[in-house]
Amino acid sequence: MSKVDLWQDATAQAELVRSGEISRTELLEATIAHVQAVNPEINAVIIPLFEKARRESELASGPFAGVPYLLKDLTVVSQGDINTSSIKGMKESGYRADHDAYFVQRMRAAGFVLLGKVNTPEMGTQVTTEPEAWGATRNPWNLGRSVGGSSGGSGAAVAAALSPVAHGNDAAGSVRIPASVCGVVGLKPTRGRISPGPLVTDSDNVAGAAHEGLFARSVRDIAALLDVVSGHRPGDTFCAPTASRPYAQGISENPGSLRVGVLTHNPVGDFALDPECAAAARGAAAALAALGHDVNDAYPEALGDRSFLKDYLTICDVAIAREIERNGELIGRPLTEDDVEWTSWEMVKRADQVTGRAFAACVDELRYYAGKVERWWEAGWDLLILPTVTRQTPEIGELMLAKGTDLEGRHTALISGSLRMLAFTVPFNVSGQPAISLPIGMSSDGMPIGVQIVAAYGREDLLLQVAAQLEGALPWVARRPQLLNPSRKIPAA
């Protein structure tokens, strides 16, 4: 019997099962053993579903029959399983979801087996994953560093080979930021590409800024996953343009010479871009130029304007207030100040001051900003390449605000922290465009640095083709985190 290396991607694992080289039971048990050995050190999987996975593995059919995956404990739910959104009161209630999200249904139909649920900051409101409800998730590359957020559990889990792929969602960079600092591939698709439904706690997907996303260690896995989970479902607020063919079918094709803009400085000027982050983006740009693309220093002028953040943050306040309200409805009692973290309750208090007319004005401003961003692509550019984050990976605890911090002045307060994590990601949540973070760079202290590529609305096909080109030109698969060094082998089935 052949042994499986759990560092192999989902496509390779599925082929081993399909060919009979390994059984789905052997694959699952090896994965469970690895999670049990490694997860106590990083705290990525907070709700293990091993017995459920064993039952589902026996019944799994489809192209990925028996391959495990992990689900972020936020918005997208799985029937019968604990659902908390990392809210203390929800965790204490023991609430279990009464349905499967469309995402979960589609993953099961493709044969994927749900292994567990992974950590997130409370309701996804932080760019580091350190909720009071479950504790901090630690970076497999350095246990003293953050995994980013809000899909930090997903990024850490895929980086540590706890599963080959994972679900995430992204309202300001919450897939791309963890992908960058954990050294994996993270895709935020076009708005409406993946259904978040049937929603139970969110309000209009944060005015369209929140998108379901995907984590993997290879571009081909991202393409295959997107084929599995894409598509409009009843009740979805937004709908992405239909792809002309499966993404996995087209990623190996040469897209021809494309016009690619590069941004390696902060156009707002309120902080300096970390030189190693800038260097990683320049390295990727040079690789694209060597592949025949027309690469130039160019970017949307709108990226030099961050005034939209005030309106965006107001919308976030209202979305969180509504999420707290609806979670209370799920457990049969209102959630109170004692049930949530102090920052979440401050958001509720601010949301209570927002009128309907003021909220509508904020949405209008985001739509206006989105148009300004998108017009750059309309002018003939195909892709934008830039750092995913603009700073080095923070330490655990560095980004958590002390209780009592004046959140009214949070734009200024976040300049040295959270804003530097999301400054280059949140504009594309507002515009709804597809964006991917690739683990191209490494810092001088051994931490991954992601490079972000952004395509025009609906053009994941082009995005993935170029991502695959970069994966071939600047391969990252041989780099493994310190947690998985040779002295500590990944269990084989």
From Swiss-Prot:
It holds the Pfam family Amidase. This is 6-aminohexanoate-cyclic-dimer hydrolase. Catalyzes the hydrolysis of 6-aminohexanoic acid cyclic dimer (1,8-diazacyclotetradecane-2,9-dione) to form the linear dimer 6-aminohexanoyl-6-aminohexanoic acid. The lineage of its organism: Bacteria, Pseudomonadati, Pseudomonadota. One of its GO terms (molecular function) is 6-aminohexanoate-cyclic-dimer hydrolase activity. Homodimer. One of its GO terms (biological process) is nylon catabolic process. It catalyses: 1,8-diazacyclotetradecane-2,9-dione + H2O = N-(6-aminohexanoyl)-6-aminohexanoate. Pathway: Xenobiotic degradation; nylon-6 oligomer degradation.
